[in-house]
Amino acid sequence: MDRAVSQVALENDEREAKNTWRLIFRIAILLLTVVTLATSVASLVYSMGASTPSDLVGIPTRISRAEEKITSALGSNQDVVDRIYKQVALESPLALLNTETTIMNAITSLSYQINGAANNSGWGAPIHDPDFIGGIGKELIVDNASDVTSFYPSAFQEHLNFIPAPTTGSGCTRIPSFDMSATHYCYTHNVILSGCRDHSHSHQYLALGVLRTTATGRIFFSTLRSISLDDTQNRKSCSVSATPLGCDMLCSKVTETEEEDYNSAVPTLMAHGRLGFDGQYHEKDLDVTTLFEDWVANYPGVGGGSFIDGRVWFSVYGGLKPNSPSDTVQEGKYVIYKRYNDTCPDEQDYQIRMAKSSYKPGRFGGKRIQQAILSIKVSTSLGEDPVLTVPPNTVTLMGAEGRILTVGTSHFLYQRGSSYFSPALLYPMTVSNKTATLHSPYTFNAFTRPGSIPCQASARCPNSCVTGVYTDPYPLIFYRNHTLRGVFGTMLDSEQARLNPASAVFDSTSRSRITRVSSSSTKAAYTTSTCFKVVKTNKTYCLSIAEISNTLFGEFRIVPLLVEILKNDGVREARSG
């Protein structure tokens, strides 16, 4: 029995000893494994130069820097993609469209001529040099961000003078009119042999030409056809327009002074003429007794016309017959435009009374002086289908000289500041069914004209007067949505006298640095401006045709002043009045 127990106890002791050694072996193996792993990790860390915990603090910063580098690289690539997209999707199609437009204009012009060949309308439609394709009649500067007055005119550039000057001391050249289409330009002025105040006889110079560039890249206006209309007709206040058939011109024919004309009972004779590409001039008198039956005096606006939708559009103005239907419909209508940051101190009722009286100045016998727009169908038959639009005086000021302009798809009417409002005005104009509609104007507070008191350059209140001078602005700078931002023009920088012609770029309140013709005592009168671009060089130029005093040969010499439009960081010069 005891032996059996001893045998069992011995077996238990042996089993426990085996278990103990197994445990020791397992622990030893586990420790060895841990040591080996630790050694391996340490070796790996050492070999890779890994950071210690204290180094890990800078990891987020390094990650941010790496992210910035990646973002910058992606942004740079995006700029390249954007430029490629702009070139492929925007600029190239636009250039092709401009080329197509010019070609279509030339084809249209040729089509008109072919259709009128039997009527001897002329052949050989001219066209500007290719450098100007897409740079005429377009929105030349499209810029949403830059200060308008950071654009400014260069010094006047020497170029070929395409305008004849007086050749005697008593000669007078006055009243320039200019218009340029995508294919050619038209120019006209009045010539009086015995001083600028003679109303009994004058002749009219009319020319057609194109823009050229010389071998050295200089611009010149090349006259291809011209004529001097020296006959028994006394054409006055002529406006010219470049159309597909040549140079269309609207003139009044007068034999009396302006005051006498307004005191007469019948409308003023008017004629629609054309200088064709063959150099021949033809003319037709309009039926003014029907077209202007409510008028006692009627004149073209002097400024250029515009070819729109198969018709030529001219600004006209004059006096209405008292109590005629056209006069009655305007009774009580008026508009008051205000100066920028310079409010009229007069009582509102008094301002309204003076504004109403401004349409009937005493100089013209109390007649209502009205603004209007005349459109004529362009065909081989002159004077065809004339339509007169008389805008309401709730939009326009007293009737005055003016100009119709087309830039891009926008049309404008410039109205001379003959009444109390001195800053330049450009009315947006829409056309439909042969008639025009004018809208509230853009005003350019620093682009003023001199005038007699109480309608001088700094005037701010409605008054009755006939004063000022013709100095039109040309739409130059636009927003991308085609809204007008700024204009170019040559103003007479004087309070009352016609002195000190100066060119500048203007926004609604101020002007750029200026380029003066000469000293502040230089006498001048009418100016008309047109801008265009040399697409090859992407340079924008503006032409101001200005009447400048000429003491040796005639009272005035008409000079084409050419500037390039430059850009800097902006030099603003506000008019203080």
From Swiss-Prot:
Glycosylation sites: N119, N144, N341, N433, N481, N538
GO BP terms: symbiont entry into host cell; virion attachment to host cell
Enzyme Commission code: 3.2.1.18
Catalytic activity: Hydrolysis of alpha-(2->3)-, alpha-(2->6)-, alpha-(2->8)- glycosidic linkages of terminal sialic acid residues in oligosaccharides, glycoproteins, glycolipids, colominic acid and synthetic substrates
Disulfide bond keyword on record: yes
Top-level class of the enzyme under EC nomenclature: hydrolase
Localization of this protein: Virion membrane; Host cell membrane
Superkingdom of origin: Viruses
TM regions (residue ranges): 23-45
Intravirion topological segments: 1-22
Region (Involved in neuraminidase activity): 234-239
GO molecular function: exo-alpha-sialidase activity; host cell surface receptor binding
Disulfide bonds: C172-C196, C186-C247, C238-C251, C344-C461, C455-C465, C531-C542
Function: Mediates the viral entry into the host cell together with fusion/F protein. Attaches the virus to sialic acid-containing cell receptors and thereby initiates infection. Binding of HN protein to the receptor induces a conformational change that allows the F protein to trigger virion/cell membranes fusion. Neuraminidase activity ensures the efficient spread of the virus by dissociating the mature virions from the neuraminic acid containing glycoproteins.
Entry's free-text remark on domains: The C-terminus (head domain) is involved in binding the cellular receptor.
Assembly notes: Homotetramer; composed of disulfide-linked homodimers. Interacts with F protein trimer. Interacts with host CG-1B; this interaction inhibits viral adsorption and replication rather than internalization.
The name this protein goes by in its record: Hemagglutinin-neuraminidase
